[in-house]
Amino acid sequence: MSIFSYLLPKKQNTASVAKERLQIIVARERSTRGGPDYLPQLQEELLQVVRKYVPVDQDAVNVQVDRESGCEILELNITLPEG
């Protein structure tokens, strides 16, 4: 290993970056597939309610439905700003 390879690490090529991004998109699509049709509307309405009290970004509210042993679990994550 030369000193140059230590000081200047190899950059990721665009193919590997594109592959990682595609994997994220596919994982997100798989998680929303098969979910109830009302989830996007529920997420938007929850975001509007939270915005009445706290300024948050569009991506601050995450709604998921998980199915475990015959039960559906509604999971709600809201990322609030510090302060």
Curated annotation (Swiss-Prot):
Classification via Gene3D superfamilies: Cell division topological specificity factor MinE (3.30.1070.10)
Keywords (A to Z) from UniProt: Cell cycle, Cell division
Pfam families xrefs: MinE
Entry's Gene Ontology BP terms: cell division; regulation of division septum assembly
Summary of the function given for this chain in its UniProt record: Prevents the cell division inhibition by proteins MinC and MinD at internal division sites while permitting inhibition at polar sites. This ensures cell division at the proper site by restricting the formation of a division septum at the midpoint of the long axis of the cell.
Family named by the database record: Belongs to the MinE family.
NCBIfam families: minE, PRK00296.1
Name by which UniProt lists this protein: Cell division topological specificity factor
Gene from which this protein is expressed: minE
